[in-house]
């Protein structure tokens, strides 16, 4: 019994150390990336026409990026909501895993009217290395009517097959270059603004 406890403790230490190393690497990568945008302009110089930002946000980070894009492009904005609230905690992870496996995504309260927009930004957090299931549900229903679509994701570090998955569901649209935003602290706000501007000006 003593040896079993010893090996269990050792396993916990090893896993914990690996987790800390991963967090350190992510933090270092974030710092390096944001340094590229330090002091750069956040001015949007490109005329995108009529713009809509569609997003889903569970924790608020995706909403923060969506709000920035909306403000910087003078866009309309639409937050997706599920018809029934998703569960929380461990049950959320199990529910999402099942939704992705069965491809039965949650029903939405309402869909945005996509009529007349030149560019539609679609934002999602990354769940299980792909887009959040409410966004996949939206894309299954959406007809972009020939508009240009630019995706953006928010994540801890790895977004897996996010881009391939959302592009595969996108109908009747010209897909523009995407952007990804790791979850970062407020100290990087100005750099994130500059990154958004750099991305949009390059579309």
Describe these PLM feature segments.
Residues 2-203:
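Active-site-proximal alpha-helix that buttresses catalytic centers in soluble enzyme cores
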């Amino acid at each position: 019994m003593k040896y079993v406890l010893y090996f269990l403790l050792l396993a916990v230490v090893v896993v914990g150390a690996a987790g800390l190393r991963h967090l350190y690497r992510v933090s270092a990568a974030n710092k390096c990336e944001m340094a590229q945008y330090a002091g750069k302009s956040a001015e949007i110089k490109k005329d995108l026409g009529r713009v809509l930002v569609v997003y889903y946000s569970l924790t608020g980070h995706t909403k923060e990026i969506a709000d920035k894009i909306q403000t910087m492009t003078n866009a309309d904005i639409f937050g997706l909501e599920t018809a029934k609230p998703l569960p929380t905690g461990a049950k959320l992870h199990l529910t999402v895993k099942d939704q992705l496996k069965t491809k039965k995504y949650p029903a939405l309260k309402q869909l945005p009217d996509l009529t007349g927009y030149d560019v539609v930004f679609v934002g999602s957090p990354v769940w299980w290395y792909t887009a959040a299931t409410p966004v996949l549900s939206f894309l299954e229903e959406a007809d972009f009517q020939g508009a240009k679509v630019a995706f953006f994701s928010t994540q801890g570090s790895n977004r897996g097959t996010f881009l391939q998955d959302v592009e595969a569901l996108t109908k009747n649209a010209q897909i523009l270059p995407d952007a990804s935003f790791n979850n970062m602290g407020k100290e990087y706000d100005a750099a994130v603004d500059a990154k958004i501007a750099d991305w949009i000006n390059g579309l």
